[in-house]
Amino acid sequence: MNLEKEIKQKAFRSEQSKLIVNLIYTYNQLKSRIATVLKKEGVTMQQYNVLRIVNGAAKEGITTSEIRERMLDKMSDASRMVDRLESMELLFKQRDRDDRRVLHIYLTDKGQSLVKRLMEQETIDQLASGVNEESAQQLNELLDAFRASL
């Protein structure tokens, strides 16, 4: 179904206007579907993003400032989220051996188990299953170019 029918709008002023509305509408649908999966596991999208980032750092660990740089939502408070995930026993902090001011953050066994479970049931790949590899690559390139123009 095309956007006009889904949101019951007759016409857009321009293709660029339609693009903006289409991006927002699509984002909201994706966010809702992903949030439903995460809610069942007791984490928010921002918390899952932190867990995903820490998981990517693996054995080396990662600092809060590095997490902040990699977050999808730049407005999120990474320090507060790390503390919350630590209280949920999903992360732990360890002081750097050489520089005691630096804290490295790691997944606990419980955190690793949760990330693994979420990656197995994560709907992201399934949500994009209607788009072939070539089209996905083209869309990614277009979105990269669009984001660069902002």
Model features per residue range: what roles?
Residues 1-11, 134-150:
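C-terminal regulatory/oligomerization modules of transcriptional regulators
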